[in-house]
Amino acid sequence: MQSKGNLGLLMLILTGYLFIFTGSSFGSAYLLEVPVWESNCLSFSFSFLLDNVSMIFVGTVLVISGSVATYCKWYMAEELYYNRFMGLVWLFVLSMVFMILVPNLLMLLIGWDGLGLTSFLLVAYYQNNKSLSAAMLTALTNRIGDVLVLISISIFLSEGGWLIYSYHPVQMWLNLGFMVVFAGMTKSAQMPFCAWLPAAMAAPTPVSSLVHSSTLVTAGVYLVLRSFYIISSNPYVTQVLMILSLFTLVLAGSSAVFAFDLKKVIALSTLSQLSLMMFSISILLPSVAFFHLVTHAVFKALLFLGAGGVIHSNQSIQDIRGLSSLWQGLPVSMGAMSVAIVSLSGAPFMSGFFSKDLMIELSMMDSSVTYGCYLLELLGLIFTSFYSARIVFSVMLGSNYVNNSTLRINEHLNMQTPFLSLYIGAIILGVVLGSKMESFGFVVVLENYESLSVFFIPFAGLILWRGVISKLGSSPWSSAKSLSFFLSMWFMESLTSHPGKVIFFKGSSTVAQSLDQGWLELLGPQGVHAGLGQFSCLNEIVQKNYFTYQLVVWGLLVAGGVSLIIFM
């Protein structure tokens, strides 16, 4: 039974690569549309869009999900609720595939909400305080995006259709672009919605591999890609997206440099790469953003699975200060992490190099990118190389504060097979897609020094690491306040989550005091109760003194009558 399951997952991985290579040479687009409801002014249909973008991305999701499912057989083997966990994982993947294939914004909401619901359940899988708070933060942040998508649907309602890839409005809605962009930013954790992404690391590592490579966080980028016509028609939207994405890039890079949690460092690297994709869309290069989306998904999944092997084999230690010289003990996992880190840094001839190099060179040629924006981009990319070198020299090769055993650890076949399947993509996917897809065939014209600067970026972080690491302990950057600033992502976690909680609780307290405990009580049950009580007290007084009142009145009447008789 287990061999049949492994064979099925292997076929899923091969099918994914078949989709990728077929989609890269796919020149047509097919729209399968089934009418559901029609009227004189409005129609609704269930539709699927099959083009090169959807085929390549579905193939990427299948490759990564098949690899992660195989990996889970080793990583989650001792879990009591393994079947429930895998059911949630497959529901997660199904929601993402549904979102990729559906161009109808109304039906896309099913996959969009499915991702939000299953991510909440997967992040809260371990059912402790940390996991539950992280799941709640993830769910509430994604609710903002859900509301913005619903507002976008209401705007599309006035246009008579919901197809986002062919939006030709009767009336141009300037706010629609902002709605779509900010909805995508909540899912892709761009500033100021970035606090939930590191918190989601409370989920099991295989879930993190799926979330940070090809499902949840990439859903926002994919929505913005599909809505490119809406965004490009409003220059203010692209300018806002450019500024926020560049600041997110620098924020994520600088925070990852000072972070000690291995999974958090990798999560922040995901955030920096997502901001690069958003930046590419903002300068009207959606195909380059998609190119990097695919290559990044593969090598980031490989990096997370390698990190999961390290953590699982070292008694769940995630602090890089407690991990050292693991190359001898975990050669396969370290090899996987090495390939992924080299590709993440944009080293020549790896998948990440082709997409990231193209993105940087085209941004140099774009007149809308100012020198300040370009410097922020370079700074963020240097940070990427810096923390990549930090992982290599600390976890793999270095001797840190804890001396771990250098004995060879048995790496299970279910652990090695996903590494092999993702090795292929991390090494050759960039050159294959770059050579086969016509939309990636840009002509780059740069000066020699500009081209050399792009080539130098992967090594800049290495040089910076070797020069700074010896002085970091005595540097003002290592003070408690500086570390607190960077480890809290520029206090973004407090600024985006704490004020919302304060406003919500104080607002609810005010509403409760003024309405629930105020006017509603005064005019409602308590007011009626008080009024009836006063009336009953008055009635009781009247009833008690009724005979006395009657006797007094009768006496007065008799006295009055007698007086009249006597004096008359």
From Swiss-Prot:
GO terms for cellular component: mitochondrial inner membrane. Pfam families: NADH5_C, Proton_antipo_M, Proton_antipo_N. This is NADH-ubiquinone oxidoreductase chain 5. It is an enzyme of class 7 (translocase). InterPro entries: NADH_DH_su5_C, ND/Mrp_TM, NU5C-like, Proton_antipo_N. Its EC number is 7.1.1.2. Signal peptide: none annotated. It comes from the Eukaryota. The keyword Membrane applies. The gene is ND5. GO terms for biological process: ATP synthesis coupled electron transport; electron transport coupled proton transport. The keyword Acetylation does not apply. It comes from Mytilus edulis. Keywords: Electron transport, Membrane, Mitochondrion, Mitochondrion inner membrane, NAD, Respiratory chain, Translocase, Transmembrane, Transmembrane helix, Transport, Ubiquinone. It is found in: Mitochondrion inner membrane. It is a multi-pass membrane protein. The chain crosses the membrane at residues 7-27, 44-64, 90-110, 144-164, 165-185, 210-232, 240-260, 274-294, 297-317, 334-354, 378-398, 426-446, 452-472, 547-567. It catalyses: a ubiquinone + NADH + 5 H(+)(in) = a ubiquinol + NAD(+) + 4 H(+)(out). GO terms for molecular function: NADH dehydrogenase (ubiquinone) activity. Belongs to the complex I subunit 5 family. Core subunit of the mitochondrial membrane respiratory chain NADH dehydrogenase (Complex I) that is believed to belong to the minimal assembly required for catalysis. Complex I functions in the transfer of electrons from NADH to the respiratory chain. The immediate electron acceptor for the enzyme is believed to be ubiquinone. Coiled coil: none annotated.
